[in-house]
Swiss-Prot record:
Belongs to the GatB/GatE family. GatB subfamily. This is Aspartyl/glutamyl-tRNA(Asn/Gln) amidotransferase subunit B. It catalyses: L-glutamyl-tRNA(Gln) + L-glutamine + ATP + H2O = L-glutaminyl-tRNA(Gln) + L-glutamate + ADP + phosphate + H(+); L-aspartyl-tRNA(Asn) + L-glutamine + ATP + H2O = L-asparaginyl-tRNA(Asn) + L-glutamate + ADP + phosphate + 2 H(+). It comes from Streptococcus pyogenes serotype M3 (strain ATCC BAA-595 / MGAS315). Pfam families: GatB_N, GatB_Yqey. Heterotrimer of A, B and C subunits. Allows the formation of correctly charged Asn-tRNA(Asn) or Gln-tRNA(Gln) through the transamidation of misacylated Asp-tRNA(Asn) or Glu-tRNA(Gln) in organisms which lack either or both of asparaginyl-tRNA or glutaminyl-tRNA synthetases. The reaction takes place in the presence of glutamine and ATP through an activated phospho-Asp-tRNA(Asn) or phospho-Glu-tRNA(Gln). GO terms for biological process: glutaminyl-tRNAGln biosynthesis via transamidation; translation.
Amino acid sequence: MNFETIIGLEVHVELNTNSKIFSPSSAHFGEDPNANTNVIDWSFPGVLPVMNKGVIDAGIKAALALNMDIHKEMHFDRKNYFYPDNPKAYQISQFDEPIGYNGWIEIKLEDGSTKKIRIERAHLEEDAGKNTHGTDGYSYVDLNRQGVPLIEIVSEADMRSPEEAYAYLTALKEIIQYTGISDVKMEEGSMRVDANISLRPYGQEQFGTKTELKNLNSFSNVRKGLEFEVERQAKLLRSGGAIRQETRRYDEANKGTILMRVKEGAADYRYFPEPDLPLYEIDDAWIDEMRAQLPQFPAQRRAKYEEELGLSAYDASQLTATKALSDFFETAVSLGGDAKQVSNWLQGEVAQFLNAEGKTIEEIALTPENLVEMIAIIADGTISSKMAKKVFVHLAKNGGSARAYVEKAGLVQISDPAVLVPIIHQVFADNEAAVADFKSGKRNADKAFTGFLMKATKGQANPQVAQQLLAQELQKLRD
């Protein structure tokens, strides 16, 4: 029997506001344990939450970017559960009226086809703290993360393979990152993924019993965990077994999933409206204000790069991998840079430099202005392509004018025959054995002179001009 795979994803995205959702504590990552906390985060008696408007702004932007309807009257709810990293014993979240609902995004698969994935809802909530279980037998609670604003994006169960789930996450991350509401760094916990997967016989309408997957700390592990579950569940069903509703975690070392707990039924969180927060009205003016702040998204930029700038689909995809890179490219082209040349540099030397340095394009000194200037002085023959690599490294580390650096460092390419011909004659005088080999007709003897000339000019001879002049002067030797 063959089975159809059914996948839905729940993605938690931390919003990059300066302060937390209901308290003035800093929401920044990486501080000492409990440094970013106050009496609200610790749930002291009598304290009340105060809404951070920037969180609603971010929620509206996310909803618009994901083609969602927006609840014009929005409220928060209490989700009741006890855990040490949740001192209130409830989480402030949204239940029946999330900020966004009924959305969709389009994904692109490896074969080039596209598919629309529906999004059920996106709701705002506060993050919980973090428990650390020490080797000394004690557990430690860090509430820095408590109250950091989240938006949870819940897809419909529209994905039919691990490949589609991977493509959905890739597209979702791109879109969220372009809005500017989150840096979506999985390694820092600002993007977290839970997956729900079930199998059903082809032709059956009813979903099978789902398994929830956690501990998915990369898109690659999401894919691997889902692939493992497809095989595990199919094997179990074919042998006459039944799938239990359970939560499993992906174990990277064993390349498989491990049981965490069995779910006897749906959890009862006893949701009820949060009495300490008002109803929030989101009018059209507010929505329009947030819409005006949104950029052009990756899909639209890729289409523009292919149709208007003549780039390949691959180049367009690489250039839109991050908003910062895409913005850099667009600025460079607007300054007169050739689109293909700028693209080649960004995907070649620039990408290699960033990987080697472990930095992003915003963190180096290179600017669109000095990259375009460098490309221009390659085109006009001021420097060679080989010399340009040295110039680029200087610009990436120090910035400044490409032309000014080339002139100051004495890197200007020598193209004047009046300068090169005397140097060629000196090369002949300094290499009599090579001249003798050439005159005697020794095979490939002429090629040695190119290296001699480049050495004599410290690599500054224009290769094309040098080859032409060498051929002329060598012919004179032969005559």
